[in-house]
From Swiss-Prot:
Recorded name of the encoding gene: yceH
Family designation: Belongs to the UPF0502 family.
Disulfide bridges in this chain: none
Pfam families associated with the record: DUF480
Protein known as: UPF0502 protein YceH
């Protein structure tokens, strides 16, 4: 694969993919918008605290690698960014809506079980059942131009295996197992996190609307 992203680059691309679907009225994003999205406390693992300068450096690098492009509207002096990571006119990576939702959630949160992915990706794509989630993951894992995800060995005491994306290169399963957070009620936690993320999105929309009305 030609995708060798750093953790920060993966966060930036994941945020742009997420906002393109969940808040299309605010997309493309300005530098400040990307900073806010990257440092968001909901639906992010780990939580980051990136500066504007750090984000700008990542954006510049990703533009050079043709994973993003800048957009300047008529009369708009603020440079905005949109993703060309997948489904762009001249790009090679083509993903379905279900695949975009899962890839985005994996980019933003790292290794997760199919159950966690179904809950956390629900704002981007409504999966009909667990079978759809699992079949989508298997397609991503077996694509000829991939693989883009891999299933990790099931951890002791866990009911489900976790999946992780491969856009940052190969994974070290041992380090992932030792650093995996404990979760006694993963499904409930996922639902709470999804609700918190939805509230955060609604707050962003309200703030944007109030700012627009105040102009």
């Amino acid at each position: 694969m030609k995708y060798e992203l750093t953790a920060t680059e993966a966060r930036v691309i994941g945020c742009l993919l997420e906002k393109q679907v969940t808040t299309p009225e605010q997309y493309p994003l300005s530098v400040n918008g990307v900073v806010t999205a990257c440092n968001q406390k909901t639906n992010r693992e780990p939580v980051m605290n990136l500066t504007e300068q750090e984000v700008q450096e990542q954006l510049d690098n990703l533009v050079k690698r043709h994973f993003l492009r800048t957009v300047s509207g008529f009369g708009n002096r603020v440079t905005k960014y949109e993703q060309r990571f997948c489904n762009s006119e001249f790009g090679d990576l083509k993903l379905s809506a279900a695949e975009v939702a899962l890839v985005t959630t994996l980019l933003l949160r790292g290794a997760q079980t199919p159950g966690e992915l179904r809950s956390r990706a629900s704002r981007m794509h409504e999966f009909s059942d667990m079978a759809e989630v699992e079949s989508t993951l298997e397609r991503l894992a077996s694509r000829e131009d991939g693989p883009y995800v891999v299933r990790l060995a099931r951890e002791p005491g866990k009911r489900e295996s976790r999946y992780i994306h491969l856009f940052c290169g190969d994974v070290d399963e041992l380090s992932l197992q030792t650093s995996a957070p404990e979760s006694a009620s993963g499904d409930l936690q996922s639902r709470v996190e999804a609700l918190e993320s939805e509230v955060a999105e609604l707050k962003q929309r309200l703030d944007s609307l109030l700012a627009h009305l105040g102009e």
